[in-house]
Amino acid sequence: MNETETGNAMLDYENQLFLDIIHENELFVFAKGVLTELVLKNVFEAYTTETSLVFVLGASKGEEAYFREKLNNEKVYTITSEEYLSNTRKVMYGNGGLFFITARILVMDLLKEIFPIDKVTGIILLKAHNIAENSQEAFILRLYRTKNKEGFIKAFSQTPTSFLLGFAKLNRVMRSSFLANVSLWPRFHAVVKQSLNLPGDDSLTHVVEIQLNLTEEMREIQTNLLDLVSWSVSELKRLVPALNDDEINAETALTHGFQKIIGAHMDAEWNTINNKAKELLNDLKVFRILLTYLTKFDCVSFYSALCNYTSSDMVFKSSWIVSTSAEKVIVASRGRILKQPKKTPNEQASGAGSKKATFKPEVHPKWLAVSEILNDTFKQSEKRVAEIATEEMSDDDSSCGLAMKSPDLKTLIFVEDSRTCSVLKDYLTDGSLEVMGKLVHNSDKIKIDLPPDLIAKLNSKRKADSEPSAKRIKISNNKDNSEGVSEAGPSNDGCSKDKDVQITLTQIRRKYETVEVFPSPVMIRPYNNPNEEDAFSVNETLLSLKPDVIVIFDPELELVRQIEIHRARMAPQQNIRVYFLVFRNSVEEQIYLTSIQREKLAFEKLIEEKASMVVPNEREAKDELNQDLWRDPSKASDAIISAQSHRNMEQTTEGREIILVDIREFRSELPSLLHKRGIDLEPLTLDVGDYILTPDICVERKSISDLIGSLNCGRLYKQAEAMGRHYKKPILLIEHEQKAQLSTRFGKNDLTQVMPKLQVLTMNFPNLRLIWSPGSHYTSEVFQELKKGKDQPSPEEAMAIQKESVGEHISTKYNPIPHSFLSKMPGIDSRNVYSILNRCESLHELANLTEKDLEETLENSHTAAVLYAGLHSETLTSDAQAATSSKLKSVKALMSKQKKPFFRVRVLKNRLSFTPNHNLRH
């Protein structure tokens, strides 16, 4: 078996997993990194035929691009935008294949039924933990199961800790997915454990964990930051009784999922929380970032980040900055960069003052560990070269096979992001003092005097680097890899002015960097991919480089699993040594161990819940007994007589209620709730309004954040004007979004300015009605009440309004000067300006129109009155006109007495112009 075949061969647990996925319709929950791209590729490949029509939901752009490239099949399509029209998609669906599609497009196609839904082979749902009862994905599966009882549904999730949030989330996800069984694949699964734990030779499983000690200053900083975290958590639990849970503690406050845990407890009470509690939540986020930076960044970058969070502007936003612990953190951070020289005995005896601190930055302990690992690797490479040479001389028959084996050991260092990759590369090539000096020299936050010799060295280095040279660094992979810079560090940490440290676009697009000053290949690779544009990049790097030594610079659970699987897959061909760097008794170690503990706890609870779960027989909706498929127009308070009464809920086609919905609204859960109430939805591209309930009622839906933005920019006034022009009963719906409460923060100025602007809006548009809704469930009930006994809206009329409002106007048809002038007139907007341009041949003709003529042209009496008043009102008030007339008479009387006037007077309409008469002397 060659190396390529070894890299593509599936392990034993992967083979069993592939068969289970193909034959079973279940919810599969995996530990991080257990579900590999190789298994998914083989699953997708099984459905890339003309006889299959399979939709894949929840895939990121990077995953879609990866699988399209790897499958290399004409039956694999990506529909993520409106580039394919409805008729084109209909033809594509008819030809079959595998479709990576967005939920918004698929839900519209299912509602319009542009293809036979019963012909769909199945739906594959990725990231199933994100599905909610009224989400787009749940809406799609409900529409799918209503018309298709035979097709499969398969759901995957690699985030088991998400099932710990909320009450019985596993059962709710299975119910929304119409799945009766769940398959759990933790790391301690017997098959997974057997496949990854290599038996026999210890060299195949050689992993070296290097535990580093924190320096004295780092330990001081960590202790004080942890004190601030503990105090903030206890104070937060005191202020918010809903957080009195054992899960809310200082340990979980350090994890990345703490915000989700807080959201699960506080979403319902966010509006009742005072500003002090919100400030504490923001402070906890800052503490978590600083504790992460402490072990990840060098001393200069950490101090620069700390300066950003402790600046004078931040004192008014966070009270922790003036605490004693914060002062100790700042002093210790500065002490890592500047060292105070010790006094000599003579200076101590004479009582001399303290000497000026000198620039002696603390070297990152992990940098020193990497240097030792590389030196050890180089020695092994030299030893390996000698052994190969000896074996070649002793046995000529085996020389051909030995020649295939490279004597150099390739080293791959995994870091978290591109910034760490660049700084570590500079350290390995230039040394720590030069890198630190470069960061300080180019920082706006740090005011430290560098030694003159170091400044001269940096300046000469900058001049040398400005010349074209490929001496040290080269791009090792030309393939585009859009690695976005993650939450890596401060914006002003010294990386913004020097090209060797700056994260440039070229560095962002690199897969990895090769440091060429060493005798053996050394590559540095960032594994964090926040933009999700390069999925499965770690596995691709491992397979393409096939490193002999792997160094995990920043510990990450998913990265460790991916390396573990790669080692097991390459074990027959290659012995891989792995170095794991971590600080002993540090927050970094605690976060890593906590992630393992939480994942194990999640699977233990999932196993218990699975064992005690009661699943109804109709869960998979193979018949009409599943109540989740019923479309019930009645209220929750109405009594249900019997299970057979659901037949009476289905109305006849003639009595069906219809609501016209703008396609952009399908991002919310309101369309799903309306459909569940027995109301048919007609997706359209509406230019006026978001929901058309009746021929007379048009609704514009706004969340609180959208409302503030629309009021500030004036967009809401134009929308209200358009609704009032075409509908008798325009409605502004202000809906409170539950999910956006924790992340949305409004300033006091925004909230205080909303009411006056709403008052102005209602005064200008008296027919506009406002509805305040606490949530989508209440909104759906209000819509149903508003539609009772009313006529159904016509899609043709709504589209006619859209065409009339937008129209097709050629910009070169109109003179740009009067067009621009007219656009600035009161009452004129981008829609009705063309009505004036088409009616009037000139501005003179416009000025001669009566107010009634303007009303007929604009089809709006209010707009016509505003425009007419702007054209014909006097420019001066009555008092100003009287003063001007009196002044004109006095000037004329004065001129009659003067033989040689000093001023030339020009009388304009309602205005006097005085010009010095200098030319009269000539």
Residue ranges, per PLM feature:
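Helicase motor interdomain insertion/brace
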Residues: N2-R68, L110-K112, S135-L141, T146-F152, ...
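Walker B catalytic acidic pair
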Residues: L125-A128, D554
